[in-house]
Each structure stands twice: as structure tokens, then as C-alpha cells.
Design a protein with these regions (language model features):
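A well-structured
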Residues: 1-163
Length: 163
């Protein structure tokens, strides 16, 4: 029976069978920096609460910010998750995954007002927002899907409780 290789031994013996995560982040330090950057977005959603129906521009700015945060958060989480999967015995990478997961929960909770508040906008007004703002047209399909959920979405407080 052969002896099981350690993670380092396996990486040395089979370098082509190891994920190259430098395409996501060059280093763990770059990951840490990106994680902090995403954390710095917490609280920026407050400027949009209660104002999504004010104008097409406000709605677009909220959706664009939430989209940007989501993109960065996904990158952070994928790196952390794959690092943990590389070596589940490494506490450092288990911590990375845990911190990234906790950040997902915080961001999701912070933005939980978004869909219920969009649904508070009258359907005709929402349609006029989309028609009047070329940037917002990028989110037309998403807004259509949200609108189809009108009968099934709770108010903002109840949605936050569920997240």
C-alpha cells in the first residue's frame, strides 16, 4: 500500500494537476486586499434605501453598484473556496472561505431591501424608467423577472429577516 502524499509533495510531484489560482489573485495578499475592498462597500447601499423610485438614474446607480459588489464578491469567494478545496487541512484557507462566506451573508442582508423596494415602484413608472435611461436598459431583463415575482415577495423587513 502506498503512502499518501502531503499537499506540498503532491504539488511538487504533479505540478500540472494543481489549480493555478494566480489567474484570480496573484497572491493571498491580493485576496486579502480584495476582501477588504468588498467589505468597504458595506453601508454604501444606505444611500439608496427609500430612494429607488426617485429616478431612473438612482435605480440604475443602485443596480450598478450592487452588480459591481456582486462581481467582486464572487471573485473573492471563488478564490477562497478553491484554496480551501486544495487543502482542507489548512486552517488559513478554511479561514479564507469562512470569511468570504460571512461577507456574502452581510452583503446579502445589506441589499435585501432592493427587490421589495423595486416592487414598490409602480409598474408603469418602472417601465418609463427603463425607456428613459439607456444605462438602465442593461437591467431590463432582471427588472422584468423581479416584476414577475410581485405576488411572491415580502416587504423589506421580512426579506431582511429571511436573509
Amino acid at each position: 500500500m502506498s503512502q499518501q502524499l502531503t499537499r506540498e509533495e503532491q504539488e511538487r510531484k504533479y505540478p500540472n494537476e494543481t489549480w493555478d489560482l494566480t489567474t484570480i489573485f496573484e497572491s493571498d495578499e491580493a485576496f486579502e486586499k480584495a476582501l477588504k475592498e468588498v467589505e468597504s462597500y458595506l453601508g454604501k447601499e444606505e444611500q439608496f434605501k427609500g430612494h429607488l423610485g426617485d429616478s431612473a438614474k438612482t435605480l440604475y446607480n443602485a443596480l450598478a453598484l450592487e452588480d459591481e459588489i456582486g462581481t467582486q464578491l464572487e471573485k473573492v469567494y471563488v478564490y477562497a473556496h478553491l484554496k480551501q478545496d486544495q487543502d482542507t487541512s489548512n486552517d488559513k484557507y478554511t479561514g479564507f472561505e469562512s470569511r468570504a462566506h460571512q461577507l456574502i451573508i452581510k452583503i446579502s442582508s445589506a441589499w435585501s431591501f432592493l427587490v421589495p423596494e423595486i416592487l414598490q415602484i409602480d409598474e408603469e413608472k418602472l417601465e418609463s424608467f427603463i425607456k428613459s435611461n439607456d444605462d438602465l436598459k442593461r437591467y431590463a431583463f432582471d427588472l422584468k423577472l423581479i416584476n414577475e415575482k410581485r405576488p411572491h415577495i415580502l416587504d423589506a423587513d421580512k426579506e431582511k429577516l429571511l436573509t
